[in-house]
């Protein structure tokens, strides 16, 4: 049996990042809603418990509390943001509105040399105080410590930014150690899990494969499964995992909805029918999809339509399979959390994903989502462990709705043709441009990244079609053509992301080639928005 960490979710958009950090320490963990029963907490028998953040306020929802068993079990507890506030309230402290809300980067001073923060710092002040670079996101604050607690961290606007009761193993921080913006956050969570909870670091991807294969076999039995194959990383790994579990009971359905990347269809058929030796059915449904998208400009409606049409195609194909009872999808956790579809149903919806938001209740197939609780980097690790080729595993992700969410406003075939050619040029230039020592000296990449392609140094890159025209001059004539935006981000988990600082020379080549080679485009811009506040995809 693996040691386990229990994560209680109060509705934060980044709760799964806590799980990811715990897994990086090779410790098994699960997320469950904050309102589980005392009996559940006791039977789960965790080595430690982590309380997540929340969009709620301790003033507005007095029911949003941790079960009493959390405090009775005698195991270490870590409270994060709202988790710190509910810990304070439930154990006799005081929380109040803050007249200075903190959202974003902050510098926190550590106090008291507690086991959680001792010798962890980003820099020291002239007075010798250890400081941490962290990410804050709170409106309330702890105003009075509960009995037995001492101050662990502070900021000028949040005098109690961390607290600890070392005797009972209770620790809490107002900032978010789970996000990458908190530079020492991974170390803090690892210290809590391995050092304070003393959990064994014995959970690895090999274990997950064995557990997932066993679960798929148990769920599916002798029934057949169809899977929507897009050529992206997620559906590829899902197909490989399910194929390992049930073999020829899986039929992959590749739908050409007219919104694919350049030469996508040929690549997918060659790769999956050839390499995976799986059953792959190729369906050209471009007229069906584009017809239903005509005149639709709202991004949510576009996603819903694309999801609905996918379901219709799958249902039609399933009728040809006498024993097809399951629809498999490559849904991963960032898809779920942005759709407000976590296990707890507490997170607010940012946008729906066709995998999780477009399925009607009348769907005649049961849903199989073996990657639903994994992050993108974990999916890649799983793909490698399954023996998939690097060109498949490390390909940049591509959304299920395809170019439909990269064409702003109405989707037209002409727009898609322009966009896929511009996108292909961008990707080609990223692949063939190698990071240099000059790039490292300019701070565009790390010294150890010199020699890698800029495609490999970015996590996701693509072009976006903007349905606006701008004036240009080509030759001696005036042009009035469309605009494309280039987007490239760097991230480890796709929950947060930084825009990629690409060399100007690379961006210049992309712009020149797109404008000269794609008739109908005369302007190229580069997106320098991070996530948050923006999402990675524009729609």
Curated annotation (Swiss-Prot):
The reaction(s) annotated as catalysed by this protein in its Swiss-Prot or TrEMBL entry are:
XMP + L-glutamine + ATP + H2O = GMP + L-glutamate + AMP + diphosphate + 2 H(+)
Any single GO molecular-function term of the entry would be: GMP synthase activity
Superkingdom: Bacteria
Specify whether Ligase is a keyword of the entry: yes
- May I ask which residue range the UniProt record assigns to the signal sequence? none
- Function as written in the Swiss-Prot or TrEMBL entry: Catalyzes the synthesis of GMP from XMP.
In Swiss-Prot or TrEMBL terms, this protein is called: GMP synthase [glutamine-hydrolyzing]
| Origin species | Cupriavidus pinatubonensis (strain JMP 134 / LMG 1197) (Cupriavidus necator (strain JMP 134))
């Amino acid at each position: 049996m693996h040691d386990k960490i229990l994560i209680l979710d109060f509705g934060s958009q980044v709760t799964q990042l806590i799980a990811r950090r715990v897994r990086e320490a090779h410790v098994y963990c699960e997320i469950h809603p904050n309102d589980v029963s005392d009996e559940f907490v006791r039977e789960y028998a965790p080595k430690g418990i982590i309380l997540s953040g929340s969009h709620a306020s301790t003033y507005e929802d007095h029911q949003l509390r941790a079960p009493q068993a959390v405090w009775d079990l005698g195991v270490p507890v870590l409270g994060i943001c709202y988790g710190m506030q509910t810990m304070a309230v439930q154990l006799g402290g005081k929380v109040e509105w803050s007249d200075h809300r903190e959202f974003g980067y902050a510098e926190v001073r550590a106090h008291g040399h507690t086991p959680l923060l001792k010798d962890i710092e980003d820099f020291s002040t002239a007075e010798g105080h250890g400081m941490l670079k962290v990410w804050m996101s709170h409106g309330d604050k702890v105003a009075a410590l509960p009995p037995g607690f001492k101050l662990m961290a502070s900021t000028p606007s949040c005098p109690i930014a961390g607290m600890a009761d070392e005797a009972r193993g209770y620790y809490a921080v107002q900032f978010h150690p789970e996000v990458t913006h908190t530079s020492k956050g991974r170390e803090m969570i690892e210290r809590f899990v391995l050092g304070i909870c003393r959990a064994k670091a014995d959970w690895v991807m090999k274990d997950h494969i064995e557990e997932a294969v066993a679960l798929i076999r148990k769920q599916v039995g002798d029934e057949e499964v169809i899977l929507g194959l897009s050529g992206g990383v997620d559906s590829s790994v899902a197909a490989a995992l399910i194929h390992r579990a049930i073999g020829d009971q899986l039929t992959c359905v590749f739908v050409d909805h007219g919104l694919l990347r350049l030469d996508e269809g040929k690549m997918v058929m060659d790769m999956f029918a050839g390499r995976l030796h799986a059953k792959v059915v190729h369906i050209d449904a471009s007229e069906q999809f584009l017809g239903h998208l005509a005149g639709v400009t709202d991004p949510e409606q576009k996603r819903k339509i694309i999801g609905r049409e996918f379901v219709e195609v799958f249902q039609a194909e399933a009728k040809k399979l006498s024993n097809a009872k399951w629809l498999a999808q490559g849904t991963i956790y960032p898809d779920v959390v942005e759709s407000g579809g976590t296990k707890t149903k507490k997170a607010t919806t940012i946008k729906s994903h066709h995998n999780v938001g477009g399925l009607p209740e009348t769907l005649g197939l049961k849903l199989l989502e073996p990657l639903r609780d994994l992050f993108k980097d974990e999916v890649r690790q799983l793909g490698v462990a399954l023996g998939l080729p690097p060109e498949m595993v490390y390909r940049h992700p591509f959304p299920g709705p395809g170019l439909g969410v990269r064409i702003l406003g109405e989707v037209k075939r002409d727009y898609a043709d322009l966009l896929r050619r511009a996108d292909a040029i961008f990707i080609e230039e990223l692949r063939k441009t190698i990071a240099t020592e000059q790039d490292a000296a300019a701070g565009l990449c790390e010294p150890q990244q010199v020699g890698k392609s800029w495609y490999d140094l970015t996590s996701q890159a693509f072009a976006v079609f903007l349905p606006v025209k701008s004036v240009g001059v080509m030759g001696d004539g005036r042009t009035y053509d469309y605009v494309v935006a280039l987007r490239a981000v760097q991230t480890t988990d796709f929950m947060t992301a930084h825009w990629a600082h690409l060399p100007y020379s690379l961006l210049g080549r992309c712009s020149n080639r797109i404008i000269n080679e794609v008739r109908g485009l005369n302007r190229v811009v580069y997106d320098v928005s991070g996530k948050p506040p923006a999402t990675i995809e524009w729609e």
